[in-house]
């Protein structure tokens, strides 16, 4: 959470093996401090083999007009699972992968806020000072919209297996589905 306060430090959180590879290549040639957040779990591939990382630019993975899920890192796969469940119920949500948290892609966030009017952020991190806070700040200052944050609620975490911790802290596709339904 306090990491976003560091000046000139660039923050990235890849969602799969291909994005991790592209980000590491970018970081290797970066002049200045970088922070790359990696999870412990193996995750399914989200990006195609010809994916090219673009510094500071989020990626729209699924289109939708009812709500937007903005996510990062290992929560991308969980968010895509939620998107599929919602789609089966006739709810069309946009899913955006913000692999670069600092600097944040204000353009993709504001486009989503203007087009869907409702945002759910999902992160495997403290919502205070993390992705949810950064997205909320962009929206509040430029295009006020409803934002709900899913993540760790400013408490000390526990140790354990990632799957158990995700369930403990509500970092599940079912929680995302419930949150989206509560705001549309």
Predicted region positions:
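Single conserved hydrophobic/aromatic residue that forms the stacking wall/gate
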Residues: 1-10
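Acidic-residue sensor for enzyme active/binding pockets
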Residues: 2, 19, 123-124
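Mid-sequence acidic-hydrophobic segments that form the walls
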Residues: 7-8, 26-30
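Conserved glycine-bearing catalytic or ligand-binding loops at nucleotide- and phosphate-handling centers
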Residues: 14-28
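Thiamine diphosphate
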Residues: 30, 34-184
């Amino acid at each position: 959470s306090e990491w976003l306060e560091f000046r000139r430090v660039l923050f990235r959180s890849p969602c799969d093996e291909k994005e991790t590879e592209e980000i590491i290549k970018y970081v290797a040639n970066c002049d200045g401090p970088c922070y790359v957040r990696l999870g412990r779990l193996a995750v399914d591939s989200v990006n195609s083999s010809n994916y090219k990382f673009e510094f500071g630019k989020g990626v729209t993975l699924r289109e939708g007009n009812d709500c937007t899920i903005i996510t990062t890192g290992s929560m991308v796969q969980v968010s895509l699972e939620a998107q599929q469940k919602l789609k089966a119920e006739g709810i069309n949500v946009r899913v955006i992968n913000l692999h670069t948290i600092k600097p944040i892609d204000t353009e993709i966030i504001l486009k989503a806020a203007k087009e869907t009017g409702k945002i759910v952020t999902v992160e495997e991190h403290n919502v205070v000072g993390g992705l949810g806070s950064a997205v909320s700040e962009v929206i509040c200052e430029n295009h006020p919209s409803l934002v709900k944050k899913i993540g760790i609620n400013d408490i000390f975490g526990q140790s354990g297996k990632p799957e158990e911790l995700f369930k403990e802290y509500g970092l599940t596709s079912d929680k995302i589905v419930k949150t989206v339904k509560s705001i549309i």
